[in-house]
Amino acid sequence: MLNGLKPLSRSLRWGMVGGGGTSQIGYSHRCAALRDNVYTLLAGALDVDAERGRAFGEQLGITPERCYADYQTLFREEAQRPDGIEVVSVTTPNNTHFAITKAALEAGLHVICEKPLCFTAEEARELVDLSKKQNKIVGVTYGYAGYQMIQQARQMIADGLLGEIRIVNMQFAHGFHNQAVELQAESTRWRVTPKFAGPSYVLGDLATHPLFVAETMAPQLNIKRLMCSRQSFVPSRAPLEDNAFVLMEYDNGAVGSMWTSAVNSGAMHSQKVRIVGEKASIEWWDEHPNQLSYEVQGEPARILERGMPYLSPNALADDRIGGGHPEGLFEAWANLYRRYAQAIDATDRDDRAFLQDFWYPDVEAGLHGVYWVEQCVKSADAGSQWVDFTLP
């Protein structure tokens, strides 16, 4: 159980790009980063409005001279300081992620980037290569993967409790945008605007979350090919989709399906991952994230609860409070930020033995998600043809 002790001997000097006073996601990043006392927020370019960003930064306790007007100035000035930042979080609109992450790596910084990492697999591959060249990590915030029960599922599958995996069923299908809410809500408009959102809406914004959760649970599975059909039920959103179906074939013979939607009227998140093996199945639902359903053929279904001593050591390592108490998304994000900090520390110490088996959503995961969306769009726009899935 985590008890507030730092996993590192010191706090990392941390900065932010984006995440200002009007940013919901920026608050989530700060809550996660500061939970375990392994980051200290020292600098930032927090807002496109420099004065507004400076005022907000001062409210957060950042000294005025380290509240910068833009990310270029942030990286340049901090590089000149003996106490300059060593890691930066990128919490800006999608269309800026590539340029900012690239500039941060070139400035010698570790990066924690909101997903998507960028818009194209070519850009993502460039960031993978640059990360290796600079010997800096890039963490990608697939926040739901930080829940304790995801690690429990991963261990159960690794231990063979499900047997050979046959089926992976994934969905993230909410109903909050079943009407053209973006016409009144500016905060939603960017999600359906290609310039800002990229080549897709729900495939990139929603589906990549359960996709990564499933891949965290069963990392041995590799997609071989896929087929996608996407729709714009609110016509003004075209060419971006607000609903999509994806079929996948894996290299071990397993099959997968994804339903992602913003027009599933009446639904909340409805994000679920079900993995079916030859002996048993598991299912996780993000609206009940502290539970994992374990179903063995011919036996009553078992609901595993977070915080209980029967869980695997890997799952209990992310435990923050005793069983029976709920943990939520901020705790899941904090688990990831803790892992990013450990990866940064190990990278700086060149501790390759630690990093070899250490899991966190890394730059390769970012590449995988970007390429998956790219291939889904390619398939859908070609009349839902099957397309190969070979990472560039």
How should these model regions be labeled?
Residues 1-62:
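N-terminal Rossmann-like dinucleotide-binding module
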Residues 1-2, 11, 143, 191, ...:
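C-terminal glycine/acidic-rich active-site capping loop/insertion
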Residues 4-11, 136, 163-167, 378-392:
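C-terminal capping/lid region of NAD(P)-dependent oxidoreductase domains
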Residues 39-42, 347-367, 387:
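Glycine- and charged-residue-rich phosphate/anionic-cofactor binding loop of Rossmann-like
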Residues 66-85:
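A structured beta-alpha segment of the ubiquitous adenosine-cofactor-binding alpha/beta core
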Residues 87, 93-145, 160:
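Beta-strand-loop-alpha-helix segment that lines the small-molecule cofactor/substrate pocket
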Residues 137, 144-238, 292:
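Predominantly a Rossmann-like dinucleotide-binding segment in NAD(P)-dependent oxidoreductases
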Residues 204-291:
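Glycine-rich, aromatic-lined ligand/substrate-binding cores of catalytic
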